[in-house]
């Protein structure tokens, strides 16, 4: 298998790529990335990869525009090195929240992302918990849409399975995600009824019974942390005994880590789809690795096996 498969990490996800490499028992290929004084990026692959299947790990975290350009340049380098196939492992798909025209004269940037990745020469995308599942339809290449929900669910069963819990969707669009966790915990669900506002949604009511229960709020992304902390405050006000926040992707923009650490949330559970630097770590944070499921997905693609057990 190692002779046919090559694994690369560009810049954003070296720790996760290392875990994937450890699972697959292959080395990470050496990539030299240079940045010129004007910000231009140049990539050089340090070994012959002709005829191989290339797997590139790159999330759209931190500076999403820079990460995207690095990925496109990497894909071009691989194509010109005569690889057999180019498979993108993008745990966190950037611009996913711009998946439709919410108002007139707005772009659909999630679709533009798909166009750029395909036009550059990618043959497949493996991603995790897209903000909007319909983004899969923006591509004309195979998409493997994996989920960290089973891993988060297993952690919750182990640590909160004996408690009286309720799984909370932070809005109506998150009900399906919350239901998947609730089914694993054999727990009821509740929904936060939000009224959209320009800068911060207003929670109008809680649909469901949370009194006396451990409320587990399940989302796909924690960005600024405002949504998670305001959800916790209203749930505690309605009688929840404690609040746990779960999300696959921890963007942690601005002062999110400080906000979450100082909030009424007991624990924040997330995955390593985004590599958080040391200054973004905090005591309440629990990180669950998705390296194994990504490694299994790569194995399945490489060996032409079904990925159904991973969904």
UniProtKB/Swiss-Prot annotation:
Instruction: Tell me the name of the encoding gene.
Output: prs2
The protein's required cofactor(s) are namely: Mg(2+)
Q: What family classification does the UniProt entry report for this protein?
A: Belongs to the ribose-phosphate pyrophosphokinase family. Class I subfamily.
Function recorded in the entry: Involved in the biosynthesis of the central metabolite phospho-alpha-D-ribosyl-1-pyrophosphate (PRPP) via the transfer of pyrophosphoryl group from ATP to 1-hydroxyl of ribose-5-phosphate (Rib-5-P).
Its subcellular locations are: Cytoplasm
Alphabetically sorted, this entry's keywords are: ATP-binding, Cytoplasm, Kinase, Magnesium, Metal-binding, Nucleotide biosynthesis, Nucleotide-binding, Transferase
Chain residues that bind ATP: 38-40, 97-98
Organism the protein comes from: Listeria monocytogenes serovar 1/2a (strain ATCC BAA-679 / EGD-e)
Write out the residues that bind Mg(2+) 1.
Answer: 131
| Name of this chain's protein | Putative ribose-phosphate pyrophosphokinase 2
Against InterPro entries, the record matches this protein to: PRib_PP_synth_CS, Pribosyltran_N, PRibTrfase_dom, PRTase-like, Rib-P_diPkinase, Rib-P_diPkinase_bac
Describe the subunit structure.
Answer: Homohexamer.
Q: What is its EC number?
A: 2.7.6.1
Which HAMAP family does the UniProt entry name for this protein?
Answer: RibP_PPkinase_B
Pathway where it operates? Metabolic intermediate biosynthesis; 5-phospho-alpha-D-ribose 1-diphosphate biosynthesis; 5-phospho-alpha-D-ribose 1-diphosphate from D-ribose 5-phosphate (route I): step 1/1
Gene Ontology terms: cellular component: cytoplasm; ribose phosphate diphosphokinase complex
Do you know which SUPFAM superfamilies this protein is assigned to? PRTase-like (SSF53271)
Which positions in this protein are listed as binding Mg(2+) 2? 171
Query: Might you name a Gene Ontology BP term for this protein?
Result: 5-phosphoribose 1-diphosphate biosynthetic process
């Amino acid at each position: 298998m190692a002779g046919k498969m090559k694994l690369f990490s560009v810049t954003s996800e070296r720790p996760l790529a290392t875990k994937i490499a450890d699972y697959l028992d292959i080395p990470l290929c050496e990539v030299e990335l240079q940045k010129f004084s004007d910000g231009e990026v140049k990539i050089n692959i340090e070994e012959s990869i002709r005829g191989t299947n290339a797997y590139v790990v790159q999330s759209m975290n931190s500076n999403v525009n820079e990460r995207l350009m690095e990925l496109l340049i990497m894909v071009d380098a691989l194509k010109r090195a005569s690889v057999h196939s180019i498979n993108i492992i993008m745990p966190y798909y950037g611009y996913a929240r711009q998946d439709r025209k919410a108002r007139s004269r707005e772009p659909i940037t999630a679709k533009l992302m798909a166009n750029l990745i395909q036009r550059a020469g990618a043959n497949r995308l493996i991603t995790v918990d897209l903000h909007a599942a319909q983004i899969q339809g923006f591509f004309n290449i195979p998409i493997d849409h994996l989920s960290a929900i089973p891993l988060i669910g297993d952690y919750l069963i182990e640590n909160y399975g004996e408690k009286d819990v309720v799984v909370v969707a932070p809005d109506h669009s998150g009900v399906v995600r919350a239901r998947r966790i609730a089914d694993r915990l054999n727990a009821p669900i509740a929904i936060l009824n939000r009224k959209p506002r320009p800068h911060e949604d207003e929670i109008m009511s809680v649909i469901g019974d949370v009194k006396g229960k451990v409320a587990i709020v399940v989302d796909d992304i924690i960005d600024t942390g405002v949504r998670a902390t305001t959800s916790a405050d209203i749930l505690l006000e309605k009688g929840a005994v404690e609040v746990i926040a779960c999300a696959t992707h921890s963007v942690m923009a601005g002062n999110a880590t400080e906000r979450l650490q100082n909030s009424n949330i007991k624990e924040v559970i997330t995955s390593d789809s985004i590599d958080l630097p040391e200054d973004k770590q905090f005591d309440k944070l629990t990180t669950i690795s998705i390296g194994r499921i990504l490694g299994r997905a790569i194995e399945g693609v490489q060996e032409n096996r079904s990925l159904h057990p991973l969904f």
